[in-house]
Swiss-Prot record:
Belongs to the somatotropin/prolactin family. Keywords: Disulfide bond, Hormone, Metal-binding, Phosphoprotein, Secreted, Signal, Zinc. This is Somatotropin. The gene is GH1. CDD domains: somatotropin_like. Disulfide bonds join 78-189, 206-214. It comes from Ailuropoda melanoleuca.
Length: 216
């Protein structure tokens, strides 16, 4: 029997509201499957928010005839391209869960500083105005990834740290073409990085808990 769509929405909302366990072994312990489900839902939500924000900025500030050439020029300016992270689902499947979690954490942490200025860019945005707590959402996902790492690493020594990429803050003036292009490029990278983090988490969840939603 097919699941009731309303029940599915309510379940997803309930999972998004669940807090992360603060310590391994905390009582009551959250099952690993629930930790992954929570992380995937949060990553999907953030990726969709980033995509919607990017599209809105594009519609508001970037002439349609210039978008393609600007997008091509942006491709080389994401700091995440300088780390040896998988670029898609197939490459991600060749990495261990711990590696994918570390890359996901790296991507999320690289945006914690810049997004604190994002709400100033979108003070009148209908899309962003409904989700003006991006920093808190990123911190929440960071905590979820760290909870998964504690579970999977089981106290084993961590590998050498990869240099954390950093992004400039968003320009809140929007008074020059340079400021517009800078923000457009940052939003493009934000969208790409969250898509990567979502992909890594979904790959891990699917190969640990085989389910019908693994085709993506």
């Amino acid at each position: 029997m097919a699941a009731d769509p309303q029940s599915s929405v309510l379940l997803a909302f309930a999972l998004l509201c669940l807090p992360w366990p603060q310590e391994v072994g905390a009582f009551p312990a959250m099952p690993l499957s629930s930790l992954f489900a929570n992380a995937v839902l949060r990553a999907q939500h953030l990726h969709q928010l980033a995509a919607d924000t990017y599209k809105e900025f594009e519609r508001a500030y970037i002439p349609e005839g210039q978008r393609y050439s600007i997008q091509n020029a942006q491709a080389a300016f994401c700091f995440s391209e300088t780390i040896p992270a998988p670029t898609g689902k197939d490459e991600a499947q060749q990495r261990s869960d711990v590696e994918l979690l570390r890359f996901s954490l790296l991507l999320i942490q690289s945006w914690l500083g810049p997004v604190q200025f994002l709400s100033r860019v979108f003070t009148n945005s209908l899309v962003f105005g409904t989700s003006d707590r991006v920093y808190e959402k990123l911190k929440d996902l960071e905590e979820g990834i760290q909870a998964l790492m504690r579970e999977l690493e089981d106290g084993s020594p961590r590998a050498g740290q990869i240099l954390k990429p950093t992004y400039d803050k968003f320009d809140t003036s929007l008074r020059s073409d340079d400021a517009l292009l800078k923000n457009y490029g940052l939003l493009s990278c934000f969208k790409k990085d969250l898509h990567k983090a979502e992909t890594y988490l979904r790959v891990m969840k699917c190969r640990r808990f085989v389910e019908s939603s693994c085709a993506f």
